[in-house]
């Protein structure tokens, strides 16, 4: 399963890697909404270990944004993300399809997303991601009709969600995959 992590979440992962990846159980922040999403990222990492493996892409456009002004800690985590993506053999396929990404990006104009958000979502769609995880409330609101702001919505095959919103679905998917393998 391909999970596209928006730039803001990639930065949180880098800044709080010890908490998210299980090395440190002490909550790194006091702000309740951010803490909920960091705990959800921590749970997603634990769920990944139960599944058949997930891919988190590191396309050029995302990496360019992440590497604008990273801290040393962020730079280290981003280099790991890029190495894993390249090792999975996904980088070549991603780089070759700029025309498709541009077409998808144009189809997203009616959503009135910020340029960077539209580009990232178009990349996620072009790569065949199942999830586009973000903590950007504006992005989430622009991809959900007003009556459905509290529901998961699919944008051209990709669910745009906060980490905390995707856990029930990912858990259910793992359960169904495990149940079918018996």
Regions found by a protein language model. Give the residues of each.
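Noncatalytic, typically N-terminal accessory segments of nucleic acid-processing enzymes
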Residues: 1-2, 8-26, 84-86, 93, ...
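Acidic, PIN/NYN-like endoribonuclease modules and their adjacent C-terminal/linker elements
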Residues: 2-4, 17-18, 22-29, 110, ...
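PIN/NYN-family metal-dependent endoribonuclease catalytic core
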Residues: 5, 10-73
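A generic local structural motif
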Residues: 42, 118-120, 146
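A short helix-to-beta-strand connector/capping loop
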Residues: 52, 86-89, 153-158
């Amino acid at each position: 399963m391909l999970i596209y992590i928006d730039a803001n979440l990639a930065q949180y992962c880098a800044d709080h890697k010890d908490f998210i990846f299980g090395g440190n159980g002490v909550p790194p922040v006091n702000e309740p909404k951010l803490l909920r999403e960091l705990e959800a990222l921590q749970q997603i990492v634990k769920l990944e270990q139960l599944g058949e493996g997930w891919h988190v892409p590191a396309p050029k456009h995302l990496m360019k944004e992440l590497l604008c002004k990273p801290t040393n800690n962020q730079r280290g985590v981003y280099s790991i993300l890029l190495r894993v993506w390249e090792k999975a053999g996904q980088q070549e396929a991603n780089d070759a399809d700029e025309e498709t990404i541009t077409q998808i990006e144009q189809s997203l104009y009616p959503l009135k997303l910020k340029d960077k958000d539209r580009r990232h979502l178009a990349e996620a769609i072009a790569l065949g991601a199942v999830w586009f995880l973000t903590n950007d409330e504006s992005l989430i609101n622009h991809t959900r009709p007003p009556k459905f702001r509290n529901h998961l919505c699919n944008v051209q095959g990709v669910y745009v969600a906060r980490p905390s919103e995707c856990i029930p679905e990912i858990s259910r998917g793992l359960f169904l995959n495990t149940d079918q393998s018996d």
